[in-house]
């Protein structure tokens, strides 16, 4: 919801700002991670909702990027970039140099298989902000984030994962 302009417009009368809320949640997350073992890899997935192939919010990462990407004590981010609701890759400029980014470029909401070359071009665009050796590829979210799951067959889900693997091998070797 932090990225959703409509959500924040609806909260205009509240006495809280996006910046205050983002800073509060960042502090809470970092406090929760304070005593984690040093060798534990901790990541954050920024989700826009994933219920039966629908979504709950939209908007690019720009509103939260300066808070989250530069300051959260995690090793990597799993970010949704499967459609126009996710915005562009420009907010990746805020990701600190010690973190990795997993690009969720393959949607888990639709059975339609993405075009490999389109995904590879999008990876190249993201690499303008994060070096390729710190980028990874995955589906945008889980295939069954809730009991009912998304509107894909098991075969279609495996095809999406095979596509991710094929692209990763071609891009990263």
Task: Give names to the regions the model predicted.
Residues 1-173:
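Domain-level signal for soluble alpha/beta catalytic cores
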């Amino acid at each position: 919801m932090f990225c959703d302009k409509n959500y924040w417009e609806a909260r205009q009368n509240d006495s809280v700002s996006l910046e205050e809320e983002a800073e509060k949640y960042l502090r809470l997350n970092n406090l929760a991670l304070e005593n984690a073992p040093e060798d534990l890899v901790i990541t954050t997935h920024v989700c826009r909702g994933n219920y039966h192939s629908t979504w709950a919010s939209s908007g690019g990462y720009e509103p939260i990027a300066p808070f989250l990407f530069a300051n959260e004590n995690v090793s990597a981010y799993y970010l949704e970039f499967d459609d126009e609701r996710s915005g562009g890759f420009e907010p990746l400029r805020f990701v600190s140099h010690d973190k990795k980014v997993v690009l969720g470029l393959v949607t888990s909401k639709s059975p339609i298989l993405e075009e490999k070359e389109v995904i590879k071009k999008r990876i190249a665009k993201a690499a303008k902000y994060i070096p390729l050796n710190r980028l990874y590829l995955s589906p945008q979210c889980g295939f069954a984030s809730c009991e009912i799951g998304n509107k894909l067959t098991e075969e279609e889900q495996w095809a999406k994962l095979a596509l991710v693997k094929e692209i990763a091998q071609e891009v990263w070797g």
